[in-house]
Amino acid sequence: MKKQILYMVCATALLSSCHIYKSYDRPEDITASGLYRDPAADNDTLASDTTNFGNLPWREVFTDPQLQSLIEQGLKQNTDLLSAALNVKAAEASLMSARLAYAPSIGLSPQGTISSFDKNAATKTYSLPVTASWQVDLFGQLLNSKRNAQVTLKQTKAYRQAVQTQVSANIANMYYTLLMLDRQLEITQATAEVLKRNAETVQALSERSTYTSAALAQSKAAYAQVVASIPDIEQSIRETENALSTFLGEAPHAIKRGVLEAQELSAGIPLQLLSNRPDVKAAEMSLASCYYNTNSARAAFYPQITLSGSAGWTNSAGSAIINPGKLLASAIGSLTQPLFYRGTNIARLKAAKAQEEQAKLSFQQTLYNAGSEVSNALSLYQNTSKKAESRQMQVESAKKASEDTKELFNLGTSTYLEVLSAQQSYLSAQISQVSDCFDKMQAVVSLYQALGGGRED
């Protein structure tokens, strides 16, 4: 009867411990589909992905040689990325430690004594024992620790990739900002030159009483207004250069760069699975880590079995001293079963379960955020593409209006105020076109980042 009870207890313990051996699987109630909003329809979602835009190496997306050089510098020198790489090394060391926990621990404890009683001759004894102990992982304590270390390593690698993606995207955005500011400065300076010539012409004509002093004042005011905006653009360029230099891990300096018109980015923007995003991977690995922590907390309720032994030479055999020494060996098996730890194990298990639920919620929210970022970037790309043709028409029309108004002014059938208005419209249209071009490039960068791009070749 006692044997039957013992067998039943052992069987119950083994069955209840089966869960602690299970590997992590994504919970079924996690929503990972239908997260993209279709930019062509208000209420539809993109249920499936197409090609691997997010898997393209960054060199195939950012083809400007100057930009490629800057990204290479950033990937080598950015302090956040270097710190993330050190976290990976630390996680690799932790995994190595978890794997070595399966091996026995071996130690050497040599001892020697010299004793004398009542001035008799000294007695010398020695022992050279080698001790070893090995934990039998019957209930998964070591297994879950190793699995936890494995997913932690994956999490740190995913975080490093996320930082790398962020570094590439930030450098590209700042680079394109510089190109946009360069083009705005070029347009503004050209406009200022035109207004300067106009003001000089009006000045000469006003001296011959062809035009009133009001027209002269208007021409000078328009010129001064445009010239006054140039230092603001130059300051923005300087600040962006300094910010990019600092981000590269360098002292502030001028940035070599190309021109806005020469930039070529992917014309078609397909989607890729959100699982390609490193932050999504990191969030899921965090959930897996909490899962294994919960398993470890469960395993703490089960016995811990340890085998230990020692062997070595000694010349002490009880009360007798023998020379030469003899070989002494021993082996011990021990089982430690938790009975009452003042509620520590129960509290630890409850805390682990709560942390696992928190990680699950965080993972789901990360998926939602990722889907939103992809949808926003895709919508921005689509809308900026739609504006391109209309904006070009606006620029061409504003240019023609400016030229025609100037001709009418020279013929005396238009006022100088109309000339200024037409030139201002032309300037505004050109600046808007530059901003649209920048928005489109920024949309590509944002979408590439949102899809987890930024990997090396």
Predicted regions and their residues:
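Periplasmic alpha-helical coiled-coil/stalk elements that build and connect Gram-negative outer-membrane
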Residues: 19, 151, 158-269, 380, ...
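Regulatory alphaC helix of protein kinase catalytic domains
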Residues: 44-73
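Amphipathic alpha-helical coiled-coil segments
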Residues: 81-84, 91, 149, 156, ...
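Sec/SRP-type N-terminal targeting helices
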Residues: 82-83, 99-100, 136-164, 214, ...
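Sec-dependent bacterial lipoprotein signal peptides
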Residues: 1-16
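A small-residue-enriched
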Residues: 18-39, 72-137, 239-252, 264, ...
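Short segments within alpha-helical structural elements
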Residues: 196, 225-252, 393-451
